[in-house]
Every structure is written in structure tokens, then in C-alpha cells.
A protein has these predicted regions:
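Short phosphate-binding loop-to-helix
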Residues: 72-107
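Acidic metal-phosphate-binding loop of nucleotide-sugar-dependent transferases
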Residues: 87, 114-118
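Short acidic donor-binding/metal-coordinating loop in glycosyltransferase active sites
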Residues: 112-115, 174
Length: 245
């Protein structure tokens, strides 16, 4: 493991210890096959293709047989560590493992969901370029891919109680990019306070940071339903044929 990453190089952290199985019976969703490959393989590929990616650290369930089988098919070596009960725990443990292997606190880290198989090379480039350009000397600097909300929002349970103005509202995506030490500190602080951030940006916000919002693509969706699986399959098949999206 290289001891230091000179910007704009970065480490990729991918939390993949989840056991959400509602989509595929006994198979965690990140290992479900879509367009001929597991979701996680699609999610990893753009980072394998990016020369700025210095290395990959996955947080996995140590007894996950799906991971053990998949690991043998990877086109390049990756680092791995045991994940935690929650996403934030897995990311925190992965960051600690990177430091233990020689990464530096000032290094950049991108965190990406294993169940977001449609992230594009262009999105990754846009995020890295924008965050590095705005970083200056602020060790809390960082940012995330996001898409402005286009739908009308309603507040209510079974009935609409109010329409929520969508101006200034964004849908957060991944990857999310921060300096390793700053993100680790934010996650450790959240854990000590019993707080569970839903993403890395929220943990940084609790530290007073204002992460940069970098426009992402609406196709960069997270698979949570069977409808999502069908949608991402269409996206990936179109891309493999050189078509949009």
C-alpha cells in the first residue's frame, strides 16, 4: 500500500457487509446478477478503470460465502476488512484499516455504495475535480454527488397534509469524497454520541462542514426493489451497446 496519495488520487471505500436479502432470497443484494455481472462488480468497475484510484478497501462480512466466491473473479487485488452492523460502522472500520496499512489522514477517500451499479466514469471525474478544486487548505473539505429534486413533494401519512417546496433540495448519491482523517473523526464522534449518520456527508455536517454538492446523473440509482433491478439492467445493457444513458 502506497504511504501517501497526492491529490487528486484517492482510495475507494465500499461498504459491502450488508445482508439485505429481500431481493434475492439467500443472496445479499450486492451479489445479485444484473446484465451478466453482480451489482458490486458493476459498482467497482469505473474505479478499477480510473488511474487516480490508488486502491480499494471493501468492508465485508467475514463469513459471507458470496463475497469469497466473488473475490476470486476480481480483475485486480483489493483490500478487505470486516464490516460492522451499520453502514457507518463499516465505513469507519474500513478507514481505520486503511490507516493501519499506511494511508495518511490527509489522503482523499471516496465512499461508494455496492448497490449503485450505474455510477459513471464522468461522475467520478466531476466529483474528484470539483472537490479538489475547492479544497484549498481545509481538511474538512469534501463533497458528494447529488441530483436536484424534480418531483413535487408532499408531507403526510395516508393523506397529503402539505406540499414541501423543493427549491434547494437535492437527492444525495454516492460516491462521497472527504479526507480520510476528517471523515474518520466525524464517524468516530458520531459513534461515541450514539448517532448513526445515513451517509458520510451527514457525519461531516455534524462537524460543521458544508460538503460541496456536485451534480450527478439520475441514472446513478441505488437498488432497493425489483423495479430498480429492471431499471439498472436496462441502463447497463444500453451502455454496453454504446447507447444512452
Amino acid at each position: 500500500l502506497t504511504s501517501h496519495v497526492t491529490p487528486p488520487r484517492y482510495w475507494l471505500v465500499m461498504p459491502a457487509a450488508g445482508r439485505g436479502k429481500r431481493l434475492g432470497g439467500a443472496t445479499p443484494k450486492q451479489f445479485l446478477t444484473v446484465a451478466g455481472r453482480p451489482l458490486i462488480a458493476w459498482a467497482l468497475q469505473p474505479f478499477f478503470d480510473d488511474p487516480r484510484c490508488a486502491g480499494v478497501m471493501l468492508a465485508v462480512a467475514p463469513d459471507d460465502t458470496d463475497w469469497l466466491s466473488f473475490r476470486a473473479s476480481l480483475p485486480r487485488p483489493v483490500l478487505e476488512t470486516s464490516g460492522g452492523a451499520e453502514r457507518a460502522d463499516s465505513v469507519r472500520l474500513a478507514l481505520q484499516a486503511l490507516l493501519a496499512r499506511g494511508a495518511q489522514a490527509a489522503d482523499w477517500v471516496l465512499v461508494h455504495d455496492a448497490a449503485r451499479p450505474c455510477v459513471s466514469n464522468a461522475e467520478i471525474k466531476a466529483l474528484v475535480d470539483a472537490v479538489v478544486a475547492h479544497a484549498e487548505a481545509d481538511l474538512r473539505a469534501g463533497g458528494l454527488l447529488a441530483v436536484p429534486l424534480a418531483d413535487t413533494l408532499k408531507r403526510g401519512r395516508s393523506h397529503s397534509e402539505a406540499t414541501v417546496p423543493r427549491e434547494g433540495l437535492w437527492r444525495a448519491l454516492t460516491p462521497q469524497m472527504f479526507r480520510l482523517g476528517a471523515l474518520l473523526h466525524a464517524l468516530q464522534q458520531a459513534e461515541s454520541e450514539g448517532r448513526k449518520p445515513t451517509d458520510e456527508a451527514q457525519a461531516m455536517e455534524w462537524q460543521g462542514s458544508e460538503p460541496l454538492l456536485v451534480g450527478g446523473e439520475s441514472t446513478n440509482i441505488k437498488v432497493t426493489t425489483f423495479a430498480d433491478l429492471r431499471l439498472v439492467e436496462g441502463i447497463l445493457q444500453a451502455r454496453s451497446k454504446g447507447e444512452s444513458p
